[in-house]
Each structure stands twice: as structure tokens, then as C-alpha cells.
Curated annotation (Swiss-Prot):
Family recorded in the similarity comment: Belongs to the amidase family. GatA subfamily.
HAMAP family the UniProt entry points to: GatA
Keywords carried by this UniProt record: ATP-binding, Ligase, Nucleotide-binding, Protein biosynthesis
UniProt key word Protein biosynthesis: yes
Pfam family, one: Amidase
Cysteine-cysteine disulfides: none
GO biological process entries: translation
InterPro entries: Amidase, Amidase_CS, Amidase_dom, AS_sf, GatA
Name the record gives this protein: Glutamyl-tRNA(Gln) amidotransferase subunit A
């Protein structure tokens, strides 16, 4: 538990030198196999910072090492979005979540690999090369926060931040056997997150158990005047309402049949096994229809690609970022900068988004997608008024082999079937490990009603006690 690490650092049972040295020994041994980082900070700098931060006796994370996804701005530390166009970009400011981490004494060890601009489900679209799953080096760790998932499963650090636009925290959590939370939209500031799709994405915590997940979420959540989409909440009341002891006998869970039917047999078997255990503990489970499931992926990708084409228009290689150099014609220079600076998947989504937003297609596609999103949100809200949670496998498949889906966009997009619904509805969703198939982790996803984040984490604590799957580290 992270609280034990903090206590050991503060009372001197664990010295900063030993703590950091052991971590860098793991990096030396494991990182060359999994490639979870894009940038790793200097060891002596980290030791000095840990020493300084443990003097902060009140810091919840005093001296704790944490890995940050490389689309979250970090003052003085390269932030690339795993793209050539931002290969040498160093932000002049910290994201709000990074400020909050530092205020509690956390130390950023480095920036994790990801799909380029968070566009992908396997961490194979990174300009810096793919990350490999610590449980099987021939397989993907999921995406787009694959580096953050792999760095936990590889045993390098205990905490990481990711971002989730359509499942980008939960997919790597499932494929790496760790915990990940996509928070309620507006509960965590997006200031400093390099945008992909503003209306869908959230920064969220990743950890190896529910207790540490809650601690990290508690640090990063809260209103921020620099992000107008954040909401004002009484954090203590919000936490108290969700953290009170959950009596499993009073819990009602809905399973969406339409989603479950699309899952592979090993995934379904692990999912049914944990449901049986929950039923034996007194949980009530109903299988219900969700006829809008078939429209979730098309609506999600239409909205996400449209927002991406707008957000990424700012990257032209003139003011900052990769430049192919001015050749006398600005139009050609812009085109060359973007053509060489962006990868194939990013260019695909920009072009599709531009097409969707063009005259004649805007109402036919984009407006219809927004209407479908509203219908999905209303239906999810209706279900969550009758049930405490909605359960599904996090991913419909086991981790695919590297190269298996990245060359087939439709196959890659279909991996997000179970996860995009929470982003469209703006509700919190959590993934945690519930089993293995051929040494490959399988995850359970739970969705809760808006602002039920702490309640979601609390039920996760109950489930990890029942399943015994937590604090997992791959034997690598």
C-alpha cells in the first residue's frame, strides 16, 4: 500500500537512496523488455526530490514515485503525446493534476508511452515504438495509456496517471491486471491535458489495488477555475457518501446482455465466475437489454474524430513542434509539417473528422451522433436509477498479439465496444482484474451513476477481497 511507503520514508525505515535505487534497478531490468516510458528522469534528481518531499510531513504522497502519461503537461519535462510533431516539446507549466500531485509530495519519475495523441487501443501507434505487455511480451498492453498500465504490471512503480477518452485507462488496466478509474466527467481538471476529444476525455488514476486508486483519485479530483468543465462539489461530503461501508446484500447490478454477447469465451467465463461469487455474497444481478449498444461505437467515433480534427489543427510546426522547414510556400510547409509530423492513425482520424464536419455531412453525421449520445446518456441514467452499477467485461477480448489489430482500424475500434458508453454518458467507470486465461489478465468493468466515483471504488474494494486479484505483478 502507498500509505506504507509514505510512512516508511517519513520514519526512516526506507531511505530515499534505497527506494530510488531499487526502482531504477527495476527500470534497468524491465524497461528494455516492455518499453513503458518515453522519458525517464535522472536518478540523482529523483533522489534529491524524494529527500526534499519527505520533509513535507502532511503530504499524502510524500516521496512517492509516480509515472505520468505523456499527454499530460509537466513543467520542464518533455511531453510528446508519443508524436513526432511534439518530439522535443517541453511545457512551460504543469497540468493541474501534476500541481496537485506535487503539492502532496509525489515525485514524477517519467512520462509513459501511449498511442499517438491517445488515438489507439494498443499503444502501437506511438512514434517511439510499441509498449509490450509484461504478462506476455508478444502481446499488447492495451491503449492508449498502455505505458501507464505496463509500468504498474512490470513492478516499476505503484501509481500512474492515464487519460480516458473511450476506454484508454480501463483497457490497459484490464490487459495488465491493474486497477483504473475513468472519473465522472468534470470531477478532475483537464487543464494541461493535450486535447484529443474535449467532451469525452478525463484524466484518471491507475494503481495496483483499490485503496491506492482511491488515494490517487482523492489527490487529483476537484474544481479548477482553469477548466470550465469542472464542477463545484463538497469533496468531503462526496467522499463520505460514497465511502460508507457497502452492504453487498443491498447491491443491485445490471448486466447488459447486448454487450456480453460480443465477448470471447475466456472473457465471458471469468466474468460469469465473479458474478457467481457476488451472488453468493448476496448481490442481486439482472440481465437486461440495451438496444442502443450497436450505436455506441459509431456515435463515439464520429464525435471523437470531429473534435480531434479541430483540436489538432493547432499543430502546424510553425510556432512549435516538428518542422520540415519553410520552402517558400506556407501552404506547402503546413502540409509537409503535418504530413511528416503525424502518424497514420492520427492522420486518418483528422481526415475523417474534417469530412464529418464539412458542409453537407455535418448534420447527416455529427448532429445525429450527438442525438444518439443523448439517447445513450438518458438510457444509462435510467438504468442507474434502478441499479447501483452496470457490469460488463472491460474488454471483449484477451490482449491481442502485437500487430494483430493495429493494421485493421475497424477491428481495433471494435475493441472499445464495452468502454465508450461511460464516456458518452459522462459517468464513472472502473476496471479491476478478476482472473487470467493462459497467464493473460481479464478485467471487470463497473459503471456507476454520475458522481458515484467513491462508491464505485468502495465496491471495488469488496470485489478485490472476494476475487483475491490485486497487487499483481508480472513475473518478468
Amino acid at each position: 500500500m502507498i500509505e506504507d511507503v509514505v510512512e516508511s520514508l517519513k520514519n526512516g525505515n526506507l531511505t530515499p537512496e534505497d527506494y530510488v535505487e531499487k526502482t531504477y534497478e527495476k527500470i534497468e531490468r524491465v524497461e528494455k523488455l516492455i518499453h513503458s516510458f518515453i522519458t525517464i528522469r535522472n536518478k540523482q534528481e529523483i533522489i534529491d526530490e524524494v529527500k526534499k518531499n519527505i520533509s513535507n510531513k502532511h503530504g499524502k504522497l510524500a516521496g512517492v514515485l509516480i509515472a505520468i502519461k505523456d499527454n499530460i503537461s509537466t513543467l520542464g519535462i518533455r511531453t510528446t503525446c508519443a508524436s513526432r510533431i511534439l518530439e522535443d516539446y517541453i511545457p512551460p507549466y504543469d497540468a493541474t493534476v501534476v500541481e496537485k500531485l506535487k503539492s502532496e509530495g509525489a515525485v514524477i519519475i517519467g512520462k509513459t508511452n501511449m498511442d499517438e495523441f491517445a488515438m489507439g487501443s494498443t499503444t502501437e501507434t506511438s512514434y517511439f515504438g510499441p509498449t509490450k505487455n509484461p504478462w506476455d511480451l508478444e502481446r499488447t498492453p492495451g491503449g492508449s495509456s498502455g505505458g501507464s498500465g505496463a509500468v504498474l504490471a512490470g513492478g516499476i512503480v505503484e501509481l500512474a496517471l492515464g487519460s480516458d477518452t473511450g476506454g484508454s485507462i480501463r483497457a490497459p488496466a484490464a490487459f495488465n491486471g491493474v486497477f483504473g478509474l475513468k472519473p465522472s466527467y468534470g470531477t478532475v481538471s483537464r487543464y494541461g491535458l493535450i486535447a484529443y476529444a474535449n467532451s469525452l476525455e478525463q484524466i484518471g488514476p491507475m494503481a495496483k489495488n483499490a485503496e491506492d486508486l482511491e488515494l490517487l483519485y482523492d489527490v487529483i479530483a476537484g474544481e479548477d477555475w482553469r477548466d470550465a468543465t469542472t464542477i463545484s462539489i463538497n469533496k468531503n461530503e462526496y467522499k463520505r457518501d460514497g465511502s460508507s461501508k457497502v452492504d453487498l446484500k443491498n447491491i443491485k447490478i445490471a448486466v447488459l446482455k447486448d454487450i456480453l454477447e460480443a465477448s470471447e469465451k475466456p472473457v465471458t467465463s471469468a466474468f460469469n465466475e465473479i458474478l457467481d461469487k457476488l451472488v453468493s455474497e448476496g448481490v442481486s444481478i439482472d440481465y437486461i437489454e440495451f438496444k442502443l449498444a450497436e450505436y455506441a461505437l459509431p456515435a463515439y467515433y464520429i464525435i471523437a474524430m470531429s473534435e480531434a480534427s479541430s483540436n489538432l489543427a493547432r499543430f502546424d510546426g510553425v510556432r512549435y513542434g516538428y518542422s520540415a522547414h519553410y520552402d517558400g510556400i506556407w501552404k506547402d510547409t503546413y502540409g509537409k509539417n503535418r504530413g511528416e509530423g503525424f502518424g497514420i492513425e492520427v492522420k486518418r482520424r483528422i481526415m475523417l473528422g474534417s469530412f464529418i464536419l464539412s458542409a453537407g455531412y455535418y448534420e447527416q453525421y455529427y448532429i445525429k451522433a450527438l442525438k444518439v449520445r443523448r439517447l445513450i446518456k438518458d438510457e444509462i441514467d435510467r438504468i442507474l436509477k434502478q441499479y447501483d452499477f452496470i457490469a460488463s467485461p472491460t474488454m471483449p477480448i484477451i490482449p491481442p498479439k502485437l500487430g494483430e489489430v493495429v493494421g485493421d482500424p475497424l477491428k481495433m475500434y471494435a475493441m472499445d465496444l464495452n468502454t465508450v458508453i461511460a464516456n458518452l454518458a459522462g459517468v464513472p467507470a472502473l476496471s479491476q482484474p478478476i482472473g487470467f486465461y493462459n497467464n493473460l489478465p481479464i478485467g471487470l468493468q463497473l459503471m456507476g451513476s454520475y458522481l458515484s466515483d467513491y462508491k464505485l471504488i468502495n465496491i471495488s474494494k469488496n470485489i478485490e477481497k472476494i476475487s483475491k486479484y490485486y497487487n499483481l505483478t508480472a513475473n518478468i
